[in-house]
């Protein structure tokens, strides 16, 4: 299946042990572009992420919109339309979706946006420095993940290219980036900042 498929399985296992992708939740998609080829590898629905194998992945031709590989007995991720929207509207190279408890908790404390500034880790985000304010939009959860598409499209249309994530209230977070390496960095940095914000709230420290 290739390097992208192996990497998705490796990362899903790592994310499982971080409690980001437990109980079959969450998913990852990686895009591979080579000449005229434009292909996405997508983690399936309902598979324990720590046990996932490369042959479990769906492979889609992004130019034609057709599946090149459909694993037997598995269902496509309900996140697929959301992954595709990030590829189309942000020219992303990868998308990570987790059920991070830090994201869920922050979604209960903040209204329409999560904001934080004057924290060193913000430098990990694109075009952000120590004094800049990181803003992550928060959208409302729906019964099915594919029903989030309209809200996600609104975020992708209204927010700047420097916005690389959206929190889904009571659900988790989607993070995208130009490559899986960058996407992973953004995801880790954001989760750090979300956790820090929760601790600051616990100790009544105002967010800068």
Swiss-Prot record:
Its cofactor is Zn(2+). Binds 1 zinc ion per subunit. GO terms for biological process: L-methionine salvage from methylthioadenosine. It holds the Pfam family Aldolase_II. InterPro entries: Aldolase_II/adducin_N, Aldolase_II/adducin_N_sf, MethylthioRu-1-P_deHdtase_MtnB, Salvage_MtnB_euk. Its main location: cytoplasm. GO terms for molecular function: methylthioribulose 1-phosphate dehydratase activity; zinc ion binding. Transmembrane segments: none annotated. Coiled coil: none annotated. Pathway: Amino-acid biosynthesis; L-methionine biosynthesis via salvage pathway; L-methionine from S-methyl-5-thio-alpha-D-ribose 1-phosphate: step 2/6. Zn(2+) binds at residues 97, 99, 171. It is found in: Cytoplasm. Catalyzes the dehydration of methylthioribulose-1-phosphate (MTRu-1-P) into 2,3-diketo-5-methylthiopentyl-1-phosphate (DK-MTP-1-P). This is Methylthioribulose-1-phosphate dehydratase. It comes from Candida glabrata (strain ATCC 2001 / BCRC 20586 / JCM 3761 / NBRC 0622 / NRRL Y-65 / CBS 138) (Yeast).
């Amino acid at each position: 299946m290739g390097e992208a498929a192996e990497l998705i399985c490796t990362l899903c296992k790592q994310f499982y042990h971080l409690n980001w992708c437990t109980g079959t939740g969450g998913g990852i998609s990686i895009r591979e572009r080579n000449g005229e080829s434009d292909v996405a590898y997508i983690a399936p629905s309902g598979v324990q992420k720590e046990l996932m194998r490369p042959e479990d992945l769906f492979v889609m031709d992004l130019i034609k919109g057709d599946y090149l590989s459909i694993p037997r007995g598995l269902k496509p991720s309900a996140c697929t339309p959301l992954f595709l929207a990030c590829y189309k509207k942000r020219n992303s190279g990868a998308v990570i979706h987790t059920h991070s408890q830090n994201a869920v908790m922050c979604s209960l404390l903040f209204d329409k946006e999560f904001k934080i500034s004057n924290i060193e880790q913000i430098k990990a985000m694109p075009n952000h420095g120590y004094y800049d304010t990181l803003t992550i939009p928060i959208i409302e959860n729906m019964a099915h993940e594919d029903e989030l598409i309209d809200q996600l499209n609104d975020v992708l249309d209204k927010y700047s290219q420097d916005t690389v994530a959206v929190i889904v209230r009571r659900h988790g977070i989607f993070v995208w980036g130009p490559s899986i390496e960058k996407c992973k960095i953004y995801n880790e940095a954001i989760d750090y900042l979300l956790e820090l914000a929760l601790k600051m709230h616990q100790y009544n420290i105002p967010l800068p």
